[in-house]
């Protein structure tokens, strides 16, 4: 919830709290609201936040509507409206939002990579929400799933229409490959822009019976590598 309490009494507005250049602030702002809308729970937003208002709220003045003359603010307002439409038209984002079976973490363990991903599930639908909170891109980042699937991009916060940094043609349809870790036998590989987020609609497919074997072999190979490196380190210390 980002209410009026967050934008008064010297606390600065939401966009003005954020680090970086003008463009970096806008990128973070898009990802912040992506997180709010894609995470379970009801949404609360205070007027002005939806266009990246820089001046704190003043009950004696109207909003600075002139901001919409500037491309970043105009694009962000359009992004916010689109984000709201996505939320209202994708049942998995609101159906069963307090049911733990409708939410599943996919990536949340590596603070150094700064990538967080989770599944939202509802009414037979599966959506994969992905955030890159770092100021650099990740190329071919692996996400491990329990089922094989195709993936279609629904929303990308770095799309040019929202003022994002992505340029040219890009791949918006993805597919899992066999092999994974931690009992998740399938891998979805994706390019993640700096401080960007994306929403993918998943289409599950029939499981490959060889996928579990491939994952087990990869896990065993990793254990052997760790064992060899540990043994080498032990010998070198003698």
Name each model-derived stretch.
Residues 22-26, 30, 35-45, 49-238:
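Carbohydrate-interacting/catalytic domains
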Residues 1-16, 39:
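Aromatic-lined glycan-binding groove of carbohydrate-active enzymes
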């Amino acid at each position: 919830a980002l209410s009026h309490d967050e934008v008064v009494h010297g606390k600065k507005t939401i966009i003005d709290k954020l680090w970086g250049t003008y463009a970096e602030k806008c990128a973070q702002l898009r990802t912040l609201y992506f997180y709010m809308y894609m995470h379970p729970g009801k949404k609360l937003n205070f007027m002005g936040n939806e266009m990246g208002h820089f001046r704190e709220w003043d009950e004696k003045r109207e909003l600075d509507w002139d901001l919409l003359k500037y491309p970043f603010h105009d694009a962000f307002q359009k992004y916010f409206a689109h984000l709201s439409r996505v939320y209202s038209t994708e049942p998995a984002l609101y159906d069963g939002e307090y049911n733990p079976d409708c939410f599943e973490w996919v990536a949340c363990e590596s603070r150094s990579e700064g990538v967080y991903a989770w599944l939202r599930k509802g009414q037979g639908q599966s959506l994969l929400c992905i955030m890159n909170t770092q100021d650099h891109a990740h190329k071919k980042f692996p996400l491990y799933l329990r089922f094989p699937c195709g993936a279609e991009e629904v929303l990308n916060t770095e799309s040019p229409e929202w003022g994002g940094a992505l340029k040219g043609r890009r791949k918006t349809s993805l597919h899992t490959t066999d092999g994974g870790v931690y009992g998740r036998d399938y891998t979805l590989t994706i390019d993640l822009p700096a401080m960007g987020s994306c929403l993918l609609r998943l289409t599950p497919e029939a499981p490959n019976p060889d996928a579990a074997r491939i994952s087990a072999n990869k896990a065993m190979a990793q254990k052997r590598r760790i064992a060899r490196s540990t043994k080498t380190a032990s010998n070198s210390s003698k």
